[in-house]
Amino acid sequence: MAHDMHSGDTERRILDSARRLFAEKGYEKTSIQDILNDLGLSKGGLYHHFKSKEAILDRLNADEWAVTARLLDKLIEHKDMSALEKLRVLIVSAVDAPDHLDLVRSQLALLKDPAFFTANMRFWSTRLPESFRSLIDMGVQDGSIPTAYPEEAAQLLSLLGNYWLMPCFYPADHAGMEHRIRCLATMLDAIGVPVFDETLILRTAEGLTALTPEEDTVSA
């Protein structure tokens, strides 16, 4: 048991170091040796956990996905909520939960790295839409999401929500962010996915505006 705990600690240290170095130097410019030097770890110690730098990057992305997957599993089990309500809870968890926002904030600099950005785009275009699609399909069945475009709606939420709404890509002040979210809400309403009510619009604008990098802050 003690060995397992130590092994887990080492793995977490590797991930924390890699996340920081990838953000500071860029993924391509960070070598395995840089991570080893930062931790004072042997090659064998690192390769016991991760076979390559790419494996570390994949794990960093998987960790974020795991948080969403756990919440999705819990939501699906709830029988006293409509699918539309569950979808709103899932979105709130992404834009209003301090732990998740801290994780996103820690990775913003990494998104400037082409390799990390590409890995995230793969996630946003494949696995994340699957999460939204499962709830949208449930909404079609229970009548709370009367859409004829479940696949397209899942893709819109995933790609626009994680790219177009992100202030690190498209800077905006609070008013500009709220206006943008209302635009997305209008698009989704038009295809029968009325997920963004007034409360969710305001909470989403608040959470995403807080992610604006200081150097990119837009003056009102």
Locate the predicted segments by residue.
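Short coil/turn segments at alpha/beta junctions that flank glycine-rich nucleotide-binding fingerprints
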Residues: E24-E28, K79, D142
